Amino acid sequence: MSEPVTPDSRTNENSPSVLQTAAAKNATTVAAKAGVTAPPQVSAADSSSPAALQVSAADSDSLAAAQASAADSDSPADSRARAVNPITEGIIWKQILFFFFPLLLSSFFQQLYNTVDALIVGRIAGKEALSAVGGSAGSVLGIFIMFYVGFSGGAAVLAAQFFGAKKDGALRDAVRTALLISGILGLTGAVLCFGFAHPILAVMHTPDDILAPSLWYLRVVSLGLIPNAVYNMGAAVLRAIGDSRRPLAILIFTCITNIALDFLFVAGLRMGAAGAAAATALCQLLSAVLVLIVLQKTVFTRSSKTAAILAGRILKLGLPLGFAEVMYTFANVVLMAVVNGFGTDTVAAYAAYGKIDALFWMVVGSFGISITTFVGQNIGAGRRDRVMQSIRDCTVMMFLVLGMVIAALYIFAYPLQQLFCADPNVVEIGGRMMRFLMPFYFLYIPIEIMFSALRGMGDSVIPTIITFFGVCVLRSVWGLAVVPLHHTVNMVLLGFPVTWAVTTIAFAIYFSLYLRRQGPAI
């Protein structure tokens, strides 16, 4: 679960860009976020059961049923022992780095094409178009995209466990079933987002001078929600089975394509926010086609089919995490509505901030995916001795790397804002936002560590409840009840560290109790 500080940060926190996708979720992912422009499982066993850290009897039954449903597609070649799996056998800290860097690059390129949208739109079409891309419309899209990111991350846990247990037939059927469900969810989001675009933007008090471009952006990008959901699921599955390089190659290609289309539609044809939206939607379609081709050549090496019993497990694993991601985004939508009341300059600064702080969220998201994948595969392989070591190694690396990221964003706050908009008032507002909030980002790191570890262990129900109250409820109350008492931008921003602190404490208590129930094996 990563939480960008803007609708786009996680790719879109996670966004048309919230592709902060992943074995556990997309960089994402990286567009609804912790908030500045909008801006982060159920288990092999039930999360309330002491057996949640292992493939339980219930899961064993599901595995057996899945195998039976895939029996006709299994062959001796499928069930033979694979080559050594470095995630379950290699030196942990080295393998984490080998797995992490392709993920980070994937998140970087995913966020790059979202950031290029903002750069080109802000510099060529002006602050009104920039506000449309990164303001209310981006926040609304972030709700759907982050749900897809979270859902795919939860479903990918099942893929990681099947892969670690070498259940190839069950893996193929699970992936096909997950892709079908993702397509249905994407269609649902597209219909809702397109059909109710105008009333949604009106409820969010979108300023009149940016309502029209926001409406165009929301409706056009909503057409890409179906391929976005499919891509997120496909990329999450590939990462869950240890392949983080091909999703990276896909993102590099689509990023380059998106930049070219941005220049064509926005700079060349002068289409403004609608042009940026068209470029995003087309590239989402391209990424979905490419990831399906890769899956066809890897996971679907033989015939596979959808399976009702797997659909139930996928929904049980994916829905809690999907809703957890939506909670962050929904809470940020509430704050976005508050920010709209400060005028277009503040909205533009908030949108730019959301693109800049994506650097933090994509690093967080990549580490979170790494934790989930290592924990999930080692549990599936029966290597529970490696679980806590994976978590410890990732924790040390996260604090070291993210400490440098936070320092860099704090120091270069104003120059980074100037990249997006030349208006001095917008730059000043955005720079103050970053300098105020950046020191608090350390509070979020423990949340990502514990949520990702629990997700890999197969526990998502209680973490989702913690997230609901610690983030969604508390942050919404902050925006609606506390901010009006002292109506300033800093008071809006203070809602992020307050909710991070409360959620971190709640996770720490639950995580320690959860591990204690598992005994010394973990």
Region locations from a protein language model:
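Short alpha-helical transmembrane segments in multi-pass integral membrane proteins
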Residues: 2-36, 41, 46-48, 54, ...
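Residue-level signal for short hydrophobic patches within transmembrane helices
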Residues: 89, 93-112, 116, 140-147, ...
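Transmembrane helical elements of multi-pass membrane transporters/channels
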Residues: 98-117, 220, 231, 254, ...
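Helix-terminus/linker motif at the lipid-water interface of multi-pass membrane proteins
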Residues: 108, 112-131, 201-208, 264-271, ...
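Membrane-helix interface/capping residues of multi-pass secondary transporters
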Residues: 118, 127-130, 168, 244, ...
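Small-residue hotspots at the loop-to-helix junctions and early N-terminal turns
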Residues: 125-139, 214, 218, 277, ...
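Small-residue-rich hydrophobic transmembrane alpha-helices
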Residues: 132-191, 228-247, 350-413, 444-466
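Short runs within selected transmembrane alpha-helices of multi-pass transporters and secretion channels
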Residues: 152, 220-239, 250-258, 276-289, ...
